[in-house]
């Protein structure tokens, strides 16, 4: 029992292993894709005689199509471009002929170079880091990630508020895509530290960004331009200054009146001033900036002008002229120390002491933050685009304050970590520009006392091109789609030849048209600086559409064959005729057959005259006329112009009789556009050219296999029908050739048979010569008459069966059988993978349905077999019509094509040997069956009859 179980398990293991191998093989087949090409049913404009081919290729920006595999630490394999294959041409697999029209559309976006941190950037300038402002600490240029690199963070540059000048964040060329963002204001709470990546050091730098401090690192995302003391309260000081001055006269004045002394001349009265001790609201000072608070107490909100983000604390005074200290004299140096901003600073309700309850206390602002304190953008950040990269501190008359983009334009991968402030493509008439930023600060102020700063982040897609359009930056026509037409056996990447590429001039939608300059395959690449291919990224989808002329069966096969054969046969027949009559040449090597005819003619007249004189022959009027006509015909053809007469009048008329009749029946002209004689097989050109030379037809035929098992049956039946038609066409050609050759030979030996007209006992030879000549002239006509009709029917039904456009795509999905018994119903009908194959345009591979009517396929086979049988039928028909028993062109043509015909039919089991074998075996089985039945009947008759049992008689 145990051994049986082990055997069963072993068998199951072997079966499981085989199944795994089968699925692995099918998986590899399913992964194969020869392209996205399609073969269209109809050519553009509905014209026939051409294959309308569409194809799609992927054109890499780096022009590298060779990958190398690298083992990663986790054990997985990573494919990377081979460094030795950048800038190579791609074979599109689109084959063209010279001057063939090709239409294409280039779709997609690519980046053909990498952006780097510019000189005089936000973090360093050439004055602070000579010759290395754009290099990291290792002396290397710092690349900027592309906008499309969603898995990479943007490059961060730290902008210090102490730098009161325009700095470059990037260098821009036409069509560049830029994404500038700012890191939000960090508020980690008390004692918290934050970090930012320093692109120059290549490390993460940290700083304490907790609230309650008056100085911060630039990575904290806040800055202040304020420093030093400022008025933060007003205090009433009694007896602060001497005011309200009065003149006082001392004792001994003339009149002794003080009041009068005020106005009395000094000559009359000596006086002095007396003042009152007055109070004043004096400034109480604090130090700017006030400690930063996370709740935004001392933070400006975003504004679109400098007036909204600046408070001039120097002009705030509790009293007029309070900034001028009292001199202690009467009167004081100023006579006005009345309250100025006391109510605003200290509050109107406060009348003594230190007052700090004014509206000013809630409106104090010292800090600018990158989140704008809830505003529309980073506060105080201004930008401009400059034509030069020079560092400059001059502010323009109109300032552009950075703003956050709308929520819909904010990349989802940025989240709340980065806030985008610039995403405008650079489309300028200038060759290049520099995007510059700075933190706003009054130009008259010493920026070195500022504190804090912002962290700016950038992504840039440089050398951006789309839809095959090219632009000139530092490299001419960068991004131009170029093509070559190279012979099929040649590879421009390895041939070592110098080529002159052509440019595909595209419109704004990427569409272009060109005529191929040569014959071969189209190779393409994107033009770029050779040094930038390795940094290029992206790819184009190039959609091709072209109409390729299908090779003509008439031009490629029949015309060369018939012209060569007919020329040789006709020349041989003329040579025979010429040699018989010794025409136009050296007569020393030939004997003029006309001399024999003359002798026979003289003998004929002499014998017939002697018989008439001796009374052995009776001559009536009819007999006399017939004999005179015979003598006239024979004697008339025995002059030196006989050959010209036959050659110029009779030979071509008789030899080309069949061609003219067949051409008239088929509706095709016997003459080409250049006036030369064509061949009578023009009616076969459309169907035979499609079968033998059309790529679309082959794809349509192979697409039948995408139907699975039923498709295999359809495919076999259709192939059989097509093979029969091909065999019939070549057999008809063989019949035509043999008939033409026989006709030419009979005409060539005409002088011999014409002489047989003289005597009654040789006249049957002349009659048979005429009969066979007519037979071989008519036989191709009768044959082609039926073939023409059947060919038209075959063409119609062939289009019914294969009338669809074909694409290379997923056609045969592979599913696990009985999956519903193991997995949930939701996983039913889900393919594991799919095998790519030719399939009709629009067919759903999940359903496998395609509109192929079995009736049309059966009709196709019937018509094809009817064409095959009609060849023999037409030969028998002509034999009856002409009453010419003997070899026919049909039998001779069948013998010529027999070997090839039987060999082709043997592949599908329809050759004569196989059919005779099937017929013989069927007859043998029928014979054995009849013998068995006869033997059974004989046995039954010879068997003794059993008598019924006799009834027992009771005793």
UniProtKB/Swiss-Prot annotation:
GO terms for cellular component: plasma membrane. Residues 1-24 form the signal peptide. It is found in: Cell membrane. Keywords: Cell membrane, Membrane, Signal, Transmembrane, Transmembrane helix. InterPro entries: Conjugal_tfr_TrbL/VirB6. This is Uncharacterized protein RBE_1263. Pfam families: TrbL (PF04610). It comes from Rickettsia bellii (strain RML369-C). GO terms for biological process: protein secretion by the type IV secretion system. It comes from the Bacteria. The chain crosses the membrane at residues 597-617, 707-727, 739-759, 781-801, 818-838, 857-877. Residues 127-146, 905-955 are annotated as: Disordered. Its main location: membrane. Belongs to the TrbL/VirB6 family. It is a multi-pass membrane protein. Residues 910-955 have a biased composition (Basic and acidic residues).
């Amino acid at each position: 029992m145990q051994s049986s179980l082990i055997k069963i398990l072993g068998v199951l293991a072997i079966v499981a292993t085989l199944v795994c191998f089968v699925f692995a093989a099918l998986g590899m087949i399913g992964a194969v894709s020869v392209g996205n090409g399609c073969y269209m049913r109809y050519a553009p404009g509905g014209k026939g005689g051409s294959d309308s081919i569409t194809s799609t290729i992927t054109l890499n920006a780096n022009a590298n199509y060779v990958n190398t595999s690298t083992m990663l630490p986790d054990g997985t394999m990573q494919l990377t471009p081979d460094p030795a294959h950048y800038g190579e041409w791609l074979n599109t697999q689109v084959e063209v002929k010279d001057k063939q029209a090709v239409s294409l559309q280039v779709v997609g976006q690519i980046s053909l170079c990498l952006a780097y941190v510019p000189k005089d950037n936000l973090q360093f300038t050439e004055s602070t880091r000579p010759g290395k402002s754009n290099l990291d600490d290792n002396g290397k240029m710092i690349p900027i990630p592309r906008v499309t690199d969603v898995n990479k963070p943007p490059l961060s540059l730290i902008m210090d508020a102490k730098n009161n000048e325009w700095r470059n964040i990037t260098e821009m060329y036409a069509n560049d895509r830029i994404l500038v963002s700012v890191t939000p204001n960090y508020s980690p709470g008390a004692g918290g530290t934050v970090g930012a990546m320093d692109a120059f050091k290549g490390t993460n730098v940290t700083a304490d960004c907790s609230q309650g401090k008056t100085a911060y690192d630039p990575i904290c995302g806040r800055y202040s331009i304020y420093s030093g003391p400022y008025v933060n309260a007003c205090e009433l000081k009694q007896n602060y200054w001497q005011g309200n001055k009065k003149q006082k006269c001392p004792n001994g004045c003339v009149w002794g009146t003080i009041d009068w002394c005020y106005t009395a001349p000094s000559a009359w009265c000596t006086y002095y001033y007396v003042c009152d001790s007055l109070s004043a609201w004096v400034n109480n000072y604090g130090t700017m900036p006030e400690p930063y608070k996370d709740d935004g107490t001392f933070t400006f909100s975003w504004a679109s002008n400098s007036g909204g983000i600046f408070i001039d604390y120097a002009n705030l005074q509790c009293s007029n002229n309070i900034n001028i200290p009292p001199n202690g004299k009467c009167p004081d140096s100023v006579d006005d120390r009345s309250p100025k901003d006391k109510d605003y600073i200290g509050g109107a309700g406060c009348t003594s002491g230190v007052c700090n309850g004014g509206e000013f206390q809630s409106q104090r602002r010292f800090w600018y933050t990158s989140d704008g304190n809830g505003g529309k953008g980073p506060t105080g950040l201004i930008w401009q685009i400059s034509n030069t990269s020079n560092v400059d501190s001059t502010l323009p008359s109109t300032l552009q304050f950075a703003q956050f983009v709308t929520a819909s334009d904010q990349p989802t991968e940025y989240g709340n970590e980065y806030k985008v402030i610039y995403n405008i493509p650079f489309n300028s008439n200038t060759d290049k520009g520099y995007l510059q930023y700075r933190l706003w600060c009054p130009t008259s102020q010493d920026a070195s006392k500022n504190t804090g700063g912002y962290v700016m982040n950038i992504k840039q897609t440089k050398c951006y091109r789309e839809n095959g359009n090219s632009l000139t930056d530092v490299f001419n026509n960068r991004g131009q789609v170029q093509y070559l037409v190279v012979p099929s056996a040649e590879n421009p990447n390895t041939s070592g030849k110098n080529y002159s590429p052509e440019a595909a001039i595209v419109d704004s939608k990427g569409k272009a048209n060109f005529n191929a300059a040569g014959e071969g395959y189209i190779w393409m690449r994107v033009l770029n600086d050779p040094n930038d291919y390795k940094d290029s990224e992206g790819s184009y989808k190039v959609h091709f559409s072209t109409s390729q002329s299908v090779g003509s069966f008439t031009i490629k096969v029949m015309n060369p064959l018939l012209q060569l054969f007919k020329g040789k046969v006709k020349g041989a027949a003329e040579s025979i005729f010429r040699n018989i009559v010794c025409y136009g040449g050296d007569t020393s090597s030939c004997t003029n057959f006309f001399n024999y005819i003359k002798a026979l003619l003289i003998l004929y007249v002499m014998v017939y005259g002697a018989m008439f004189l001796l009374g052995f022959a009776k001559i009536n009027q009819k007999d006399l006329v017939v004999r005179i006509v015979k003598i006239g015909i024979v004697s008339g053809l025995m002059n030196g112009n006989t050959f010209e007469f036959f050659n110029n009048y009779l030979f071509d008329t008789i030899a080309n009789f069949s061609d003219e009749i067949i051409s008239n029946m088929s509706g095709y002209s016997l003459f080409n556009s250049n006036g030369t004689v064509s061949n009578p097989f023009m009616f076969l050109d459309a169907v035979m050219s499609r079968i033998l030379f059309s790529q679309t037809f082959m794809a349509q035929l192979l697409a039948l296999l995408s139907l699975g098992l039923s498709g295999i049956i359809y495919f076999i039946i259709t192939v059989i029908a097509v093979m029969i038609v091909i065999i019939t066409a070549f057999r008809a050609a063989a019949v035509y050739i043999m008939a033409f050759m026989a006709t030419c030979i009979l005409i060539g030996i005409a002088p011999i048979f014409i002489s047989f007209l003289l005597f009654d006992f040789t006249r049957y030879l002349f009659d048979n010569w005429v009969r066979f000549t007519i037979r071989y002239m008519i036989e191709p006509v009768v044959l082609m008459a039926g073939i023409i009709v059947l060919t038209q029917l075959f063409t119609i039904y062939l289009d019914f069966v294969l009338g669809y456009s074909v694409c290379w795509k997923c056609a045969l999905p592979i599913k696990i059988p009985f999956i519903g018994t193991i997995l949930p119903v939701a996983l039913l009908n889900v393919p594991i993978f799919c095998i790519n194959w030719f399939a009709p345009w629009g067919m759903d591979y999940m359903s496998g349905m395609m509109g192929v009517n079995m009736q049309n396929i059966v009709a196709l086979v019937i018509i094809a077999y009817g064409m095959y049988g009609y060849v023999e039928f037409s030969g028998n028909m002509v034999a009856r019509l002409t009453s010419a028993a003997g070899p026919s062109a049909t039998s001779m043509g069948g013998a010529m094509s027999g070997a090839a015909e039987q060999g082709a039919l043997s592949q599908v089991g329809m050759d004569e040997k196989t059919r005779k074998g099937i017929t013989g075996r069927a007859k043998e089985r029928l014979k054995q069956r009849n013998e068995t039945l006869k033997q059974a009947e004989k046995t039954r008759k010879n068997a003794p009859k059993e008598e019924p049992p006799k009834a027992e008689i009771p005793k």
